[in-house]
């Protein structure tokens, strides 16, 4: 038997001796009631509501004698009609669950088909699908089987087998279970490329109402430990403690990843050391306080964690969780505003250095008086606007407090968030494109990072005109209201919020604005749709 597997077995047995799980929950992980194909159909379908999976962010190439690679450009994705990613083998290890979260289809009280994969079955499926070029990697999540520690043991055993016995060198994203031990969290970080812990809801009140078995502290605690461990491992191999961001961020002094913003965030955090009250005015302050109260500024300290890492991973040739960590929030299950969601998002990026925050429009599945009624259309357009706002935070130098406020807590869904912001700050427009700096250009609707870079480069060598701006990628149907080129507007239009709003809505008006959600269903394409199963 492989030395790593022997080590894992010893650790697992030691942890099981400490494990206090509900012995009345008699669930056999081998579950002989279903074939592997039937389990795949059940558990792939059960995983479709988890959207927190994208490309790897890793640069690990293929190796002789090993299977797969995690090169960033090699993780290619197909998307279903509703935007769900289907290129990873996205499955649950089990949909048995000891928790009774009201929003979840797999909640304990639901009468649904239950199945559980063994680690070997998951490995076989991953390798066989990869060899057939159906998938590019594995996204593994799970319900709570017996208890968090037992569940994480089985998930880590699966990853260990993939990395050692099957020599799988491809991309792996694991959804960790809050409440599992630090030992298992450490081993998951060495074995997977990306780790995520779902925040689920942006407030403690929302969690208490819909997920009584979960607390914000138990979710943020592993998130903070993973962040600290990633930072220490990055520094150990000569990199910055912070995750790599878009190169354009170095020109955005007001962005959430700028040195000034990081110092301000640290200053706010330190200012709370003598203040035991959690501010109710800002979700960012709430997350800062949780980070301090739960002692999150410490790396995972299990000295034997490297023993679970396959070969070269244990010698710091590869960062701990090289693709970083992510999380997911449900949109529309509770009454939080866009402002609360965006403030929470910014706090997660700054306080926990998350690589991505994902949003999932809630699809009513369960009958409960605190949830939207079954048949209520999911807020897909709101989800889309939040993703656009998320990009403004990560790539355009905006802060959450600029985009929304307590006085205006929600986006105008009829126009994109950047236009919404510009219309509330018309005193800053029009912008002269031949003189404005990169950061100012990025705040103009219709101008993105690439076109802003092209503008700043091209104007060194000559004058610009609207034809050249169009060739550079500027979306003039939105931008022309907010810019001048050579002191002239493209059309003579009044700089008035009501007029521009009407024009933008008419320009961008498509069928989605008049969608009538009648007899519609929202489903994710599965592997069976492609004739895989």
Residue ranges and their predicted role:
Residues 2-96, 475, 483-484, 491-521, ...:
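Flexible, acidic/Gly-rich N-terminal and inter-domain linker regions that tether
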